[in-house]
């Protein structure tokens, strides 16, 4: 598979994929099957509608070679959706789309899993999913002794711990679930007491975290 780009001459047609990347033409050859600029722009329009976070620059980088398995997988799903569900697909784009899906699936032998997100506040603050103290939490008395207590990892696996203070359920919708340990009741009604016997019990051979 070869990706061809050009910034020389007149632009083939007015489309953001070309204009935003300062290109006049863009094409791919997959096993001697030519995928034109128009076909790639058509695919981009559908892919960006399914994944609004991707822009023209990211899509061009994707065409040259995906960075991770998640990005590659979402692109292949778009190609498959086009072939199986897109009733407006021009017939001349069908074979190039088939060949692209066949070529890009081979990238799975090269790409690596996406690294864990560093945007999770709990992961940054907690070492090995252990409770950690915080100076304040909105909705709790300013003089309360407060801890953030992770109760599951990102895969949903419960975290074992031995608690000696009252726990309150956080209204947070974050994937890394946690509760708040406080020696004083909250001032806000949105926090309610949390009880989970499976998380409070220590399994044989484990060393639960102690507050």
From Swiss-Prot:
UniProt superkingdom: Viruses
This protein's record includes keyword Zinc: no
Subunit: Homodimer.
Similarity comment: Belongs to the tenuiviruses p3 protein family.
Keywords, ordered alphabetically: Host cytoplasm, Host-virus interaction, Inhibition of host innate immune response by virus, RNA-binding, Suppressor of RNA silencing, Viral immunoevasion
GO cellular component, one term: host cell cytoplasm
Subcellular localization, as worded in the UniProt entry: Host cytoplasm
Protein name: Suppressor of RNA silencing p3
GO biological process: symbiont-mediated suppression of host innate immune response
Role, per record: Acts as a suppressor of RNA-mediated gene silencing, also known as post-transcriptional gene silencing (PTGS), presumably through the binding of dsRNA.
GO terms of molecular function: RNA binding
Lineage summary: Viruses, Riboviria, Orthornavirae, Negarnaviricota, Polyploviricotina
Database matches in Pfam families: Tenui_NS3
